[in-house]
Amino acid sequence: SAGNVRRKRKEQTMHRIAKFHFVSPGQFLTAMQEGYPQYTEAQIKEMYENLKLPRRATKGSAGYDFFAPFAFTLAPGETIKIPTGIRAEMKEDWVLQIYPRSGLGFKYRLQMNNTVGIIDSDYFFSDNEGHIFMKITNDSNEGKTVEVPAGTGFAQGIFMQYGITEDDDAEGIRNGGFGSTTK
């Protein structure tokens, strides 16, 4: 049918520019112990074994859903920093933009603390293995508490291509983790 032909053409024109990976068990353990000392090493190991790589829900989805490595609850005004256990390898002229899942943003005003998370292509090679962290806040002005069970999608990442200026002369090389390029 004509619909199948259009879908097939669209699939052929989609750019395959990235791949998700898990960080090492040691990196996940370190991140979890720093932020969540209440969890035992055995509990963190179990969380790591249950991590899911981000994936699109449908063929038409632009966003790759990121899944909560552990259950969390956010009352209005509360913030949490989540080590996802995920890293993203992508072509040089692409960026991964991170947003809350639409439903959580709409129902609870769940927001990224930096509005949009930006994962640069060279972050993959940083000292922390390019471990993607997400800091989110329940900005509800209706008194709504959000509960996210472990393994549930809570954020989404969208790959976007970008350009540079004709006279760009950036030569720096990333070696640190989050926020290291501003030091």
Locations of regions flagged by a protein language model:
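Non-catalytic terminal segments and appended small domains
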Residues: G3-K183
